Structure formats: C-alpha cells, structure tokens
C-alpha cells in the first residue's frame, strides 16, 4: 500500500511537470507573439517570431505528451515519451540556435552567415542523432553521451568564437553562458531513469524555451531597469 502511494505520488510529480511546462510554453508564445507584432525593429521582430514558433511547436508536443499521460493513466510508457521528444527537438533546437546567433550577432552589429549556421545545425543534428540511438538502445548510453557532448562542445565553440569572443560588454557572455549551462544539463538528465529524466527534461525545457524567451522579452523591452 505504501509503495503504491509512493509510485502514484512520483507519477503525479512527473505529470505536474508536463502540465506546468505546457502552460508556460503557451504563456511565452503569447508574450513573444504580441511583442513581435508591436516592435518596429526588424531584427528584434525576427527573434521574437522565432521564439514564438519555438514555444508553439514545443507546446504542441507537450499537448501530445499530456494527452498520452491522461489516456494511459498509471501505465505511461515514459521511454516512448522520451523518444518522442527528439521529434520536438529536431524542429525546435535549430530555431533556438538561430535565435541565439541572431541575438549575439545583433549585439555586435554583424550578420549571421550561412556557413557558420549550417555547421552549427549539422553538429546539433549529430548530437540529437546519437542521443536518439542511445535512447532506443541502438548504441550504448555512455557512448552516445560521449559523442553527443563532443558535438555539443564543437557547436558552442563555433558560436563563442564567432559571436562572443569579439563582443564588448557582458550581454553576449551572459546569454551564451545561460544557453551553454542549460543545454549541458540535458546531458546529465539523459543518464537518469525515465521518470526523473522526464521531470528534468521538462524543467530544462522551461528554462531553455520559456525563461529564455521571456528573458529576451525583458531584455528588449527594457521593462526592468538595472541600476
């Protein structure tokens, strides 16, 4: 009886993390969409358009996750949900990287070049590919982790070398560090058991997609003054 209650409580925590992430994604999409319509600065509008797309796409997949959880009840296949995330990530992560590069490039008055962006996205897809192989047991999880972090390091090195190293001030360094930290934590969560992994992925999605999107809104609208 005690074990049954514990399992139900643990599952309720996972379900709640899905619900709250979905709500925050829809909130972020609303805020960034309104700001994209309001601003008259083209580069900022492009960034908010991307952030809106990211939140809507991720929100759509979270609606699928929530529907599966509600339909399956106590027999949720968490591993299947973990695998479905890769479809979400294959669409949203390139958009997130493009948005990051646009913000960083805009701050140093440069353009985002196709060659650099293509290399970053190819490394991103390689990282996702080996992650999926580990998720489906087609590759050992530790080998997948090692190869994935190699691609991750190469990807963020390109971003740093192109857009952060030459920047003046701390804006680009702070944003780059936030992205680097949150994205690297996905690699740690990847090694957890399924329920804890899904909770961590949900929390990290909240930061990577919601908090970053809302943070950019605060940054560009200057609604919070730093004395």
Where are these regions (language model features)?
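Hydrophobic alpha-helical signal peptides and transmembrane signal-/tail-anchor segments
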Residues: 1-5
């Amino acid at each position: 009886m005690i074990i049954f209650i514990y399992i139900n409580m643990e599952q309720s925590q996972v379900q709640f993390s899905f619900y709250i992430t979905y709500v925050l994604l829809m909130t972020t999409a609303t805020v960034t969409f309104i700001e994209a319509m309001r601003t008259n600065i083209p580069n900022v509008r492009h960034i908010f358009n991307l952030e809106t797309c990211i939140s809507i796409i991720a929100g759509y997949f979270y609606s699928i996750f929530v529907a599966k959880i509600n339909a399956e009840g106590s027999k949720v296949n968490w591993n299947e949900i973990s695998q479905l995330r890769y479809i979400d990530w294959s669409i949203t992560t390139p958009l997130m990287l493009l948005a990051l590069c646009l913000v960083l490039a805009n701050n140093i008055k440069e353009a985002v070049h196709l060659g650099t962006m293509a290399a970053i996205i190819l490394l991103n897809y390689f990282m996702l590919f080996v992650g999926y192989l580990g998720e489906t047991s087609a590759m050992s999880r530790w080998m997948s982790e090692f190869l994935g972090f190699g691609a991750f390091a190469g990807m963020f090195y390109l971003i740093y070398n192109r857009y952060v190293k030459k920047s003046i001030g701390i804006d680009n360094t702070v944003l780059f560090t936030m992205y680097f930290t949150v994205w690297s934590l996905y690699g740690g969560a990847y090694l957890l058991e399924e329920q804890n992994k899904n909770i961590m992925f949900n929390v990290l999605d909240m930061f990577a997609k919601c908090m970053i999107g809302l943070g950019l809104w605060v940054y560009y609208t200057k609604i919070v003054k730093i004395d």
